[in-house]
Amino acid sequence: MSMVYINIFLAFILSFMGLLIYRSHLMSSLLCLEGMMLSLFIMMTVTILTNHLTLASMTPIILLVFAACEAALGLSLLVMISNTYGTDYVQNLNLLQC
């Protein structure tokens, strides 16, 4: 396993640990999720380029599309919660249920 893979895996683990530690605020959770998506994108791209997998070359682009959709939904939820309650606590998400 090369140093590139180790560093990318370490970035993923640090983002995941940040998600577990800072889960009370929505903005921190969204930033950690974006870090996880970025490390997954880089790992998939490096793996595809080193193994010359031409059939799977579209997979990182699809991952970026899903990451952009996730970020847009998360930011819209963050704006709605912060306008309604004035904070970005995740515990306010339970109040949005019908």
Curated annotation (Swiss-Prot):
It catalyses: a ubiquinone + NADH + 5 H(+)(in) = a ubiquinol + NAD(+) + 4 H(+)(out). The chain crosses the membrane at residues 1-21, 30-50, 61-81. Gene3D superfamilies: 1.10.287.3510. It is a multi-pass membrane protein. It holds the Pfam family Oxidored_q2. Its EC number is 7.1.1.2. GO terms for cellular component: mitochondrial inner membrane; respiratory chain complex I. It comes from the Eukaryota. The keyword Transmembrane helix applies. GO terms for biological process: ATP synthesis coupled electron transport. Disulfide bonds: none annotated. Its main location: mitochondrion. InterPro entries: NADH_UbQ_OxRdtase_chain4L/K, NUOK/Mnh_C1-like. It is found in: Mitochondrion inner membrane. GO terms for molecular function: NADH dehydrogenase (ubiquinone) activity. Keywords: Electron transport, Membrane, Mitochondrion, Mitochondrion inner membrane, NAD, Respiratory chain, Translocase, Transmembrane, Transmembrane helix, Transport, Ubiquinone. PANTHER family: NADH-UBIQUINONE OXIDOREDUCTASE CHAIN 4L, NADH-UBIQUINONE OXIDOREDUCTASE SUBUNIT ND4L. Core subunit of the mitochondrial membrane respiratory chain NADH dehydrogenase (Complex I) which catalyzes electron transfer from NADH through the respiratory chain, using ubiquinone as an electron acceptor. Part of the enzyme membrane arm which is embedded in the lipid bilayer and involved in proton translocation. Belongs to the complex I subunit 4L family. Core subunit of respiratory chain NADH dehydrogenase (Complex I) which is composed of 45 different subunits. This is NADH-ubiquinone oxidoreductase chain 4L. The gene is MT-ND4L.
